[in-house]
Amino acid sequence: MAAITHPVAGSELFAQDTENRKLFAEHFDHQPFLFRHALNTMDLFQMPALLKLAQKCMDKRQQKSHFETGQPVVDGFFGNKPADLTLVQALERIGEGSNWIILKRIHEEPENREALEAFITELSELTGIDLRRKYHDPILTIFITSPNRVTPYHLDGEANFLAQVQGSKTVYVYNANDPYILTEEEKEKYWTGNLLAPRWHEELSNGQWHFDVKPGTGVFNPATFPHWVKNTDNVSVSVSVNFKRVRNDSIGAYRTNYFTRKLGLRPTVPGKSPSVDRIKSLTFGNLYTGMHSTRKALRSKLGV
């Protein structure tokens, strides 16, 4: 896709011109698009600050951040965490090896929380949606990737703004509403915990959309749209802002359908009947969520 060349004006974090506003207003949470930003100018996201942030992440009692090494392929699985490296060491060697680092929930640090709040304010203005009211649990994450590394095909359950701040890479995105791309069974398995259920195959080629991103540009990816990423021959740093819908009955409906299908029945596809989706979400969907939350809390308390 053609690169965007217009700079972001003034002190705006995201470009506010007519072109950018139209993209956000028309495509947010419906279709991927390329946008412009100025996050690459922020000291918070430069390597010296990231090294300090990685150390803070390591020092936390409950470590949410993650790193791995290896050379995964598009249709493969993610890499493995090396036993002989710490998070900070992996970041220090990011240009030499084949590492992929995720600094998770960095908005828990005060300076990053302030940045996230500024992002939410501007993104609400651009989309025309009050993201603080219609969406919840906004998450600020940083991805740092070694040269030429692939991030395998997968999907995320949140709407995602991915802003490139260092290096360049290509993001390949697929339409989650196309049953050839993502079957109902794959969606049901994903929402009941099998995050690897959606599988890439050769016929999918290089995405229905592909975006070449560089510092100052980024990609919006709607919730559940499968994607994979190919880094170029440089270290890549990307800032991700994720949002979850406050009300999303389709999730509960998919969870209900998963077990309904196990009984040999053919459940109604979510989206065809909002009232049916709502009933499913309020009954079994809520029960599943409660059971999952209880299990997660217990495992965290027991350290397993």
Model regions and ranges:
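Non-heme Fe(II)/2-oxoglutarate
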Residues: 18, 53, 231-304
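Catalytic micro-motifs at enzyme active sites that drive phosphoryl/nucleotidyl and oxygen chemistry
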Residues: 21-23, 88-92, 128-132, 147-153
